[in-house]
Amino acid sequence: MSWFHRERAGINRTQIKKSRVPQGMWVKCPGCSATLLAKDLDANLNVCPTCGHHHRIGARRRLESLLDAATWQELDSGMTSVDFLQFKDSKSYQERIDSALSKGGSRDAVVCVEGSIEGTAVQVAVFDFSFMGGSMGSVVGEKITRAIERGVQKRQPVIIVSASGGARMQESILSLMQMAKTSAALAKLKDAGLPFISILTDPTTGGVTASFAMLGDINIAEPKALIGFAGPRVIEQTLRQKLPDGFQRAEYLLEHGMLDVIVPRTEMRAKLASILGILYRPAA
């Protein structure tokens, strides 16, 4: 008898096809490490149902969550940044613009619309952090200024939702000028007796914090949002001191009088409607 003769049939090794999980179907929460269905997270406005961690959210999805359905219209959507300084670091500014545009989202770091909240007409500007870190250049400053000026002209409240790394370094002094430009426009809104509501989300830093983001008649933040000028690591290295726990987080700023209220994203629309009902009376 041959040593290699098989007297019994071998194990059936029929290959079972492995099922492929679609990319992006699951999301791991950085707050509690829970694995969440992406569609469930989106349905809850990117707020973790387990721990309440506020994931970042796109500008248009945020607008859908805040404004009355089918009432808002985007304005100044064709404006795009130009590399007028021929700025180049590891790659040119124009390459960075083209890369951001290729993602197919916003044409710059802010989306400005006219819409309504519970029937109250408002001018709203929402930052898109996915576009060059929500940095403020000349286009962002101009779009925000125009939104504020429309508010003055039409006697409507202005709401700005910030999510930004600050002024756009590729535009040098012209980006810093937007801080004064937007703040001056808000002074006109104040003189007209119209409310400005500032919503600070994670992160709101740099020149955006140092200008319009902290000038609201009501300053609202999302839970645990990072809000500050320089980053905590830069401050620690400069001062050579350990910063307090929770420094630059929304809760710390509220405790020290820098904010009026912290509102979860899922409750933001109702809170805005309530505030507008108190601060604003439409012209008859």
Swiss-Prot record:
Zinc finger map (C4-type): 29-51
Gene3D superfamilies: 2-enoyl-CoA Hydratase, Chain A, domain 1
Keyword line: ATP-binding, Cytoplasm, Fatty acid biosynthesis, Fatty acid metabolism, Lipid biosynthesis, Lipid metabolism, Metal-binding, Nucleotide-binding, Transferase, Zinc, Zinc-finger
UniProt: Zn(2+) binding residues: 29, 32, 48, 51
Cofactor: record remark: Binds 1 zinc ion per subunit.
Main EC class the enzyme belongs to: transferase
UniProt main location, coarse: cytoplasm
Quaternary data: Acetyl-CoA carboxylase is a heterohexamer composed of biotin carboxyl carrier protein (AccB), biotin carboxylase (AccC) and two subunits each of ACCase subunit alpha (AccA) and ACCase subunit beta (AccD).
Name of the featured protein: Acetyl-coenzyme A carboxylase carboxyl transferase subunit beta
Species whose genome carries this gene: Pelobacter propionicus (strain DSM 2379 / NBRC 103807 / OttBd1)
